[in-house]
Every structure is written in structure tokens, then in C-alpha cells.
Amino acid sequence: MKVSEFDYELPPELIAQEPVEPRDASRLMVLHRKTQRIEHRIFREIIEYLEPGDLLVLNVSKVIPARLYARKKTGASIEILLIERLEEGIWKCLVRPGQKVKKGTELVIDEDLSAVCLGRGEDGTRILKFQPQDDRLIFEKGRTPLPPYIKNEVPLERYQTVYAKEEGSVAAPTAGLHFTPELIEKLKKKGVQFAEVVLHVGIGTFRPVKVEEVEKHKMHEEFYQVPKETVRKLRETRERGNRIVAVGTTTVRTLETIARLPEQEEYVGKTDLFIYPPFEFKLVDALVTNFHLPRSTLLMLVAAFAGKDFVMEAYREAVKRRYRFFSFGDAMLIL
């Protein structure tokens, strides 16, 4: 399958530059897979599509202030993006321009914080050891790691879901940005159940698909965790005959990863599961997601779930109706 099959025309002004206030006032496109029908709603109306006993599964990973600006002793500017914590104060990072940072290169962030390069990781990453080795201090100096298509500085809390709690992502699991505490409360009152997983969104989010054949693309590994209580709730939802509704593509990848493993009480590991058409979904019955970049692995996942032709038609409709796209954009519910 060709990557070009997942391309579409997007006027740049439809790329959302800031989030909607309140969060649940964004638009919601509802896709009915069985009837191939499309509806246009407001996100808070999602409650009308969920039944008592349905299970909403949230990725509670929290975005870290992963972007840092440093200088070499020569005065050259270097941008650092924290990717993965190896131990306290030692991180796998992306650095730009990379060719200027070799083993032994010292980087000064400010008078309180510096780093030295211990060597190269795979994928052109660098291993940096910070001085002092204090993650709290590193996070204090860091900024929101916004995607390159967002031009404005946005406070970290608006690039964070209201339920985020496990630090480790370098990009937000954006489908969750539409939920407010009030909407969650209303859903609970209706009898909708909630469960949590963790998948720390990693470097793959910033990396475009560079191959022409979809099947040749390799995903980066990302850490995930599914606690005992969630495993129990997933099983009980299945037994009741209710739906498992994944909030976000990261949640889908976590659930479909564990669906392919031997049964366990809880799950912790790394996944590089790449979902593209055709794909047999074993756990996920419905999906809440955003509008994704052309040719992206996220769009391929959505196409695998709802059917490529139907999804590409829905995207053309979204452009026509001036939906807002990408991280701060509108949402889609696929039933």
C-alpha cells in the first residue's frame, strides 16, 4: 500500500494554532461505520453516543516541558528535545543542529544547568548527562514541546489533558484535550465507566513517514503500562456486552498491543505496534480522535479502524466544512 493514498489537501489556515475555550466546545464529527453516515456535532454532545456501562479508556500520560535551549562554549545555539529518561538527570535527546554535538560536547542552558554529551543513541539521538542530575530542575527550565506547525507559545497546561498524571510524553495524547472535569462528571453520572492506561508519546510523533510503501515503515518503541484495575474493567466490559471506547490513537495502540499478548494481571512494556489497513481490532469498539496530518501513521490507524475510503471522504468533508485540524483542532468519534 502506498503512503500517498493517505494524502489530502489541507489549507494551512485550518491548522488550529490555539485550543478552543472551553475545551468541550470544539466540533465533533461522528462517523457511523455500519451505515457510512457522518454527523456534525459539538464535543460535549458525545454523551448522547455513550451508554451506561460503556468503558472510556484514557491515556493519563503527562507532557513534560521537554524543549530546552542551550549554547556551546563557542556560542553556537543548540535546541534540545528530551525524548526518554534513562535515569535521574540522564536523557536520550534530539539535538539541533546535531552535527555540532559530539561525545564530550558541553552545553550550557543557564547558570544553574548544563549538560555534557555522553555519546550517540540510535536514530541520531544523543545521550545527555545534565549537571546537576535533577529532573525537577530540568523541567523548570524546559518549555512546552509544541509540534512545529504550531507557531504560538502555549502554556503547558493547555497542551495537557485535565486527567494527565504520569510524566513522560513529549507530545500530548491530543484526543483527550477536549474533556473537561464537568463533562467527565456528567458521563460518570450517566453510568459511563472510566479506565486508565499510560503510553508515553515519544519521538515517532515528530518523525514523518519517509518510505513510499506503508508496510516498510517502522514505529519507534514507546513505554506503556496497563494496571490491574484497567485489565479487570476491560474484562468486565466485554462480559457485560458493552463497548470499549479508546480515547486517542495512543490508547488504541496500547490496548491492541496487550490484546496480542498472553493474558496477564497487568502489563508493562514497550510497543512498536504499527496499525494500518487491513488490521483486526481485538479490543477497541469505538474511537475518539483528532484530525491527523496527511501521510501520518495516525491517519493510517484511523483508516484501519473505519475503512480508508470512508475516512478520506470524511477528511474531505471536514476541509469543506472548515473543521480545525491537528493537535488543537476538532475531534472525531468513530462508532
Swiss-Prot record:
Protein's gene: queA
Biological function: Transfers and isomerizes the ribose moiety from AdoMet to the 7-aminomethyl group of 7-deazaguanine (preQ1-tRNA) to give epoxyqueuosine (oQ-tRNA).
EC number(s) reported in the record: 2.4.99.17
Enzyme class: transferase
Localisation: Cytoplasm
Subunit and partners: Monomer.
Cellular-component GO terms for this entry: cytoplasm
PANTHER family: S-ADENOSYLMETHIONINE:TRNA RIBOSYLTRANSFERASE-ISOMERASE (PTHR30307:SF0)
SUPFAM superfamilies: QueA-like (SSF111337)
Swiss-Prot/TrEMBL GO biological process terms: queuosine biosynthetic process; tRNA wobble guanine modification
Catalytic activity: 7-aminomethyl-7-carbaguanosine(34) in tRNA + S-adenosyl-L-methionine = epoxyqueuosine(34) in tRNA + adenine + L-methionine + 2 H(+)
Family classification: Belongs to the QueA family.
Main location: cytoplasm
Keywords carried by this UniProt record: Cytoplasm, Queuosine biosynthesis, S-adenosyl-L-methionine, Transferase
The protein's annotated pathway: tRNA modification; tRNA-queuosine biosynthesis
Gene3D superfamilies, alphabetized: QueA-like (3.40.1780.10)
Protein name: S-adenosylmethionine:tRNA ribosyltransferase-isomerase
Gene Ontology terms for molecular function: S-adenosylmethionine:tRNA ribosyltransferase-isomerase activity
Organism whose genome encodes this protein: Thermotoga maritima (strain ATCC 43589 / DSM 3109 / JCM 10099 / NBRC 100826 / MSB8)
Keyword Transferase among record annotations: yes
